Amino acid sequence: MAPSLSPGPAALRRAPQLLLLLLAAECALAALLPAREATQFLRPRQRRAFQVFEEAKQGHLERECVEELCSREEAREVFENDPETDYFYPRYLDCINKYGSPYTKNSGFATCVQNLPDQCTPNPCDRKGTQACQDLMGNFFCLCKAGWGGRLCDKDVNECSQENGGCLQICHNKPGSFHCSCHSGFELSSDGRTCQDIDECADSEACGEARCKNLPGSYSCLCDEGFAYSSQEKACRDVDECLQGRCEQVCVNSPGSYTCHCDGRGGLKLSQDMDTCEDILPCVPFSVAKSVKSLYLGRMFSGTPVIRLRFKRLQPTRLVAEFDFRTFDPEGILLFAGGHQDSTWIVLALRAGRLELQLRYNGVGRVTSSGPVINHGMWQTISVEELARNLVIKVNRDAVMKIAVAGDLFQPERGLYHLNLTVGGIPFHEKDLVQPINPRLDGCMRSWNWLNGEDTTIQETVKVNTRMQCFSVTERGSFYPGSGFAFYSLDYMRTPLDVGTESTWEVEVVAHIRPAADTGVLFALWAPDLRAVPLSVALVDYHSTKKLKKQLVVLAVEHTALALMEIKVCDGQEHVVTVSLRDGEATLEVDGTRGQSEVSAAQLQERLAVLERHLRSPVLTFAGGLPDVPVTSAPVTAFYRGCMTLEVNRRLLDLDEAAYKHSDITAHSCPPVEPAAA
């Protein structure tokens, strides 16, 4: 057991410590720090305050417990507090057990005892997170680096949990620290916390062929309407809208766009949305009422008669025929009376607007013409009377022809006298006439009387068949009802007089129109071998490329519009459409105003070259419509409805001379527009 120390020397040893403690306390009170700094540095400052005592303590420890063997009470006198004593003394005994008593003079014992008061040896703090370890009275304090916490500085501080660590966008926590980053499309600013947009469009290759638009944090590659961006190819590729089923009927895709087509021949056109179809309806009312007491002579385009009568009499009988007649047609057959073509007969016809009589008696034929011009559209009464040796033709009761004849029209056969009478045609081919004539006659007959007898059979037939009836009121012109067409075989190539020079071509069209509907083909060329439409002029109620509803006249080669011109198609007035095409030139005019070209100069030359190639092969000229062609063959395939006269290459087209004409088209008469309601 260690010898006890006397009180006197111990008290003397504690006096300097007390004096230093009072001085240190005075200094600590004089220095005032902010709360945060005081918290961080309170423990280190306490450590420094005890530094003098620690040095003194180390000297006492050397004398009391290293050079000599000390008791717990003596150790308490060295440390002057229980915590450090409680920490020191058990370990002091461990040093004795390990190295022997102080009296063995083992250097390891001295080192072991001298290190026991420093609780930072060995360092209990986490090496990674600790800035310094501070020894305290029986304890220690770990001063943590920024970003670390906990008693041993081994706990990471999550700076991102408070106000996102001060980062504008993304905060990344990591052991002992953190860093800011930005979303895609942004880059970190020099302050390390805020973000600024990256202009991806500064790179010319960002979108390749497409237009680049910078966006906050991103960018977009833009294409024109009708195109979609391909990120793999970095290019704009056409969108096939037809695969999306946008059109009600026929869809045609084109680069950046598409067009819908409707069955024009079926009476349909594009509706307002340019995708669906609607009926083509009249926009101008025409006076198409018909008279049940009239007989239309032009119904049969073939020239065959509209009425055939056969009279049989027991006694010799003479022909008497009277009727009212109206026409604008200058040529055609009114009636035939007689036997077969090699026997006796007469034909009453019109030529150049005047009555003409062809007759054949006993194999001898004659032709005579006389009287006023009667194709003025007014009603007049015409009569044919067979006398003993004469034929008398009267107009409005005035005799215009009196012709001596040798024989009778009624011919005896098997005990009866026979007479064939046909109206609007002859019972044989017109080439067998005395003088050939176009038999087709757009004329109207009423109040007919044959052989002074009442003809109820014909009247009843006409009454129930509107196609045999005439319009109640007509004007000069040709009427297209919207249900058919006519066509001609015309040649548009011209060979110059100079031998050896190349042939040239020309297409000039003048159309006088008074439309009843806003859609329909006025004029067109058709190549039968290719089933193509080399040229067309038509009314249309929309602009195909602008997808805008507008009343227009369109001039096109095949499906490509060369020129467009606005027209007030539904005003009930007559308009003049003029078209001129030749090598290097294509013009369209409406009422003297030139239309707008829809193609470049190079495209025009290419289209005209296509037209010329077609003109060097057989083509047919169509009026009022097209044959059964694909709806994509031309901008318009619908039939025209309204009045129209056509002049082609300075020649007036006579529908009676067409190679074909729909029976509902009237060649030389047209109903007027109905007067506006009062």
UniProtKB/Swiss-Prot annotation:
<dbReference type="InterPro" id="IPR035972">
    <property type="entry name" value="GLA-like_dom_SF"/>
</dbReference>
<feature type="disulfide bond">
    <location>
        <begin position="160"/>
        <end position="171"/>
    </location>
</feature>
<feature type="domain" description="Laminin G-like 2">
    <location>
        <begin position="477"/>
        <end position="670"/>
    </location>
</feature>
<dbReference type="GO" id="GO:0005788">
    <property type="term" value="C:endoplasmic reticulum lumen"/>
</dbReference>
<protein>
    <recommendedName>
        <fullName>Growth arrest-specific protein 6</fullName>
    </recommendedName>
</protein>
<dbReference type="GO" id="GO:0046718">
    <property type="term" value="P:symbiont entry into host cell"/>
</dbReference>
<dbReference type="GO" id="GO:0070588">
    <property type="term" value="P:calcium ion transmembrane transport"/>
</dbReference>
<dbReference type="GO" id="GO:0048146">
    <property type="term" value="P:positive regulation of fibroblast proliferation"/>
</dbReference>
<dbReference type="Pfam" id="PF00054">
    <property type="entry name" value="Laminin_G_1"/>
</dbReference>
<dbReference type="GO" id="GO:0031093">
    <property type="term" value="C:platelet alpha granule lumen"/>
</dbReference>
<dbReference type="InterPro" id="IPR017857">
    <property type="entry name" value="Coagulation_fac-like_Gla_dom"/>
</dbReference>
<feature type="domain" description="Gla">
    <location>
        <begin position="53"/>
        <end position="94"/>
    </location>
</feature>
<dbReference type="InterPro" id="IPR013032">
    <property type="entry name" value="EGF-like_CS"/>
</dbReference>
<dbReference type="GO" id="GO:0070062">
    <property type="term" value="C:extracellular exosome"/>
</dbReference>
<keyword id="KW-0341">Growth regulation</keyword>
<dbReference type="Pfam" id="PF00594">
    <property type="entry name" value="Gla"/>
</dbReference>
<dbReference type="GO" id="GO:0001764">
    <property type="term" value="P:neuron migration"/>
</dbReference>
<feature type="modified residue" description="Phosphoserine; by FAM20C">
    <location>
        <position position="71"/>
    </location>
</feature>
<keyword id="KW-0945">Host-virus interaction</keyword>
<dbReference type="GO" id="GO:0007166">
    <property type="term" value="P:cell surface receptor signaling pathway"/>
</dbReference>
<dbReference type="GO" id="GO:2000669">
    <property type="term" value="P:negative regulation of dendritic cell apoptotic process"/>
</dbReference>
<dbReference type="GO" id="GO:0043277">
    <property type="term" value="P:apoptotic cell clearance"/>
</dbReference>
<feature type="disulfide bond">
    <location>
        <begin position="283"/>
        <end position="570"/>
    </location>
</feature>
<dbReference type="GO" id="GO:0031589">
    <property type="term" value="P:cell-substrate adhesion"/>
</dbReference>
<dbReference type="GO" id="GO:0051897">
    <property type="term" value="P:positive regulation of phosphatidylinositol 3-kinase/protein kinase B signal transduction"/>
</dbReference>
<dbReference type="GO" id="GO:0032008">
    <property type="term" value="P:positive regulation of TOR signaling"/>
</dbReference>
<feature type="modified residue" description="Phosphothreonine">
    <location>
        <position position="637"/>
    </location>
</feature>
<dbReference type="GO" id="GO:0050766">
    <property type="term" value="P:positive regulation of phagocytosis"/>
</dbReference>
<dbReference type="GO" id="GO:2000270">
    <property type="term" value="P:negative regulation of fibroblast apoptotic process"/>
</dbReference>
<keyword id="KW-0301">Gamma-carboxyglutamic acid</keyword>
<dbReference type="GO" id="GO:0032692">
    <property type="term" value="P:negative regulation of interleukin-1 production"/>
</dbReference>
<feature type="disulfide bond">
    <location>
        <begin position="444"/>
        <end position="470"/>
    </location>
</feature>
<dbReference type="GO" id="GO:0072659">
    <property type="term" value="P:protein localization to plasma membrane"/>
</dbReference>
<feature type="disulfide bond">
    <location>
        <begin position="144"/>
        <end position="153"/>
    </location>
</feature>
<feature type="domain" description="EGF-like 3; calcium-binding">
    <location>
        <begin position="197"/>
        <end position="237"/>
    </location>
</feature>
<feature type="disulfide bond">
    <location>
        <begin position="201"/>
        <end position="212"/>
    </location>
</feature>
<dbReference type="GO" id="GO:0007165">
    <property type="term" value="P:signal transduction"/>
</dbReference>
<feature type="binding site">
    <location>
        <position position="331"/>
    </location>
    <ligand>
        <name>Ca(2+)</name>
    </ligand>
</feature>
<dbReference type="GO" id="GO:2000510">
    <property type="term" value="P:positive regulation of dendritic cell chemotaxis"/>
</dbReference>
<feature type="disulfide bond">
    <location>
        <begin position="262"/>
        <end position="277"/>
    </location>
</feature>
<dbReference type="GO" id="GO:0045892">
    <property type="term" value="P:negative regulation of DNA-templated transcription"/>
</dbReference>
<dbReference type="InterPro" id="IPR026823">
    <property type="entry name" value="cEGF"/>
</dbReference>
